[in-house]
Amino acid sequence: MIYFHDIDPIALSLGPIKVHWYGIMYLLGFTAAWLLGRKRIAAGRLPGVDANGFSDLLFYAMLGVVLGGRIGYMLFYALGDFLHNPLLLFKVWDGGMSFHGGLLGVLGACWWWSRKHKLHFFDTMDFMAPLVPLGLGFGRIGNFIGAELWGKYTDGTWGVVFPSGLPAPLNQLDHATLQAQFATGALNQFARHPSQLYEAFLEGLVMFVVLWAVSAKPRHRYLVGGLFALMYGLFRFAVEFVRMPDNGVYVAFDWLTRGQILSLPLIAFGLVLLVMSRRAPVLQPQLPVTAGGKA
């Protein structure tokens, strides 16, 4: 049954302060990552690091997501606007975050943190990889609630009519008028793939279940990080076929998107890590030692 999107993106208004669902989804993602990360620390999945050390790591990773995501968006998707007005970088309230930029930010933060704590960088990445899909899944749900990053038109019964995705002059009509037209079936031809939910399922739920299961037992170094890069790259590349291209423009061949191009290096990187993992040492959990000297 085709659905008419009428969810208010603002969850709560306190005078001039508006709390958006997208921000709440980010908070839920980070909270879930913090709780499950502490559980993994207690199980000895990152030897030499306690709960406080992990909290520091997650804090720097959060900074990496925000800074890298914003800078990446401006460089990958809005370079012309950024060069014309560099101050746009700081207008985060206008939206615009890039996963690939956020990933680079997280990698940079984890590299710095690992070097500071004298840990192998990829041990840190293998530890963090199962936690990232939590943020991805909640973030994509936030995209759906905010009616952004919608997909292409579909005649499937699971399609969604996004008022902001309607062509002119329909997108100028008030909400009540659009709902009345939707009730007659007049807007069914404008139903779109809920690509945000596809990504929430694949990049969020599926990746979390797989990576959590693999990382829950002794495994070779590079394996979990390699699976993360490969799976995300493949899932993102596939979903891009039913997702509207960023800025409505294809990069090449009238089908290749910028998101797909940015995913290709991830796929290659993931394959390289998986090959490297075959000769890498097997990582065994080491339970933290208590004050009494017993694990």
Curated annotation (Swiss-Prot):
Q: What class of enzyme is it?
A: transferase
The membrane topology of this protein is:
Multi-pass membrane protein
One GO cellular component term: plasma membrane
| Keyword set, alphabetical order | Cell inner membrane, Cell membrane, Membrane, Transferase, Transmembrane, Transmembrane helix
Q: Name one GO biological process term.
A: lipoprotein biosynthetic process
Its domain of life reads Bacteria
Q: Which NCBIfam families match?
A: lgt (TIGR00544)
The identity of this protein, by name, is Phosphatidylglycerol--prolipoprotein diacylglyceryl transferase
Native source species = Stenotrophomonas maltophilia (strain K279a)
